[in-house]
């Protein structure tokens, strides 16, 4: 009886490790994807509402446009491509919408990504998925593009904050 109980306890304790070992690549992608959404949302909350129209040069996107891009293309479309899950209809977003509407939309889009990435399995990463411009890519490629896109746009938002005399979230002391 003692031996059986010990074996069962060992199996229960080891089970999470076995499960994690079955998806090392998708677990790595999920780990990368956990940090950036918070930084991006914090940056969106940090920028004053009256600065959402700010852009460093006429050719660049406004801060509000960056947020809209993240909501629509950067999150719903990319996370859908990476996971194979159909994205919900996000509704309409314009760069001139209120800060509150844009931040709420941004949070909702990241929630979809969190749910989509939670389902991602290594066995699916080589599956083909539709991508921008009618191209086909692998789900793994789409997942990596998503995480890279978040890093790119967070750095963009951080620069916009600094140009307006504000510290980006990752530059603040805890």
Predicted ranges, named:
Residues 1-5:
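Positively charged n-region of N-terminal signal peptides that target proteins for export
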Residues 30-41, 51-91, 130-174:
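Short, contiguous alpha-helical
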Residues 48-52, 82, 118, 122-125:
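Short, flexible helix-adjacent loops and helix caps
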Residues 95-130, 137-153:
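Acidic/histidine-rich alpha-helical segments that form the ligand environment
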Residues 39, 43-44, 78, 109-117:
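Well-ordered alpha-helical scaffold segments within catalytic/enzyme domains
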């Amino acid at each position: 009886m003692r031996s059986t109980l010990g074996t069962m306890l060992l199996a229960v304790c080891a089970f999470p490790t076995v499960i994690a070992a079955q998806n090392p690549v998708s677990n790595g992608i999920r780990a990368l994807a956990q940090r950036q959404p918070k930084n991006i949302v914090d940056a969106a909350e940090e920028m004053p509402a009256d600065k959402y129209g700010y852009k460093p040069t006429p050719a660049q996107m406004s801060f509000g446009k960056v947020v809209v891009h993240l909501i629509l293309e950067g999150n719903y479309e990319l996370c859908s491509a990476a996971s194979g899950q159909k994205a919900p209809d996000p509704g309409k977003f314009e760069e001139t919408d209120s800060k509150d509407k844009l931040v709420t939309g941004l949070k909702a889009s990241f929630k979809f990504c969190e749910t989509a990435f939670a389902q991602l399995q290594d066995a699916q990463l080589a599956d083909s998925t539709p991508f921008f411009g009618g191209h086909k890519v692998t789900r793994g490629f789409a997942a990596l593009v998503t995480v890279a896109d978040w890093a790119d746009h967070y750095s963009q938002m951080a620069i916009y904050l600094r140009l307006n005399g504000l510290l980006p979230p990752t530059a603040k002391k805890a």
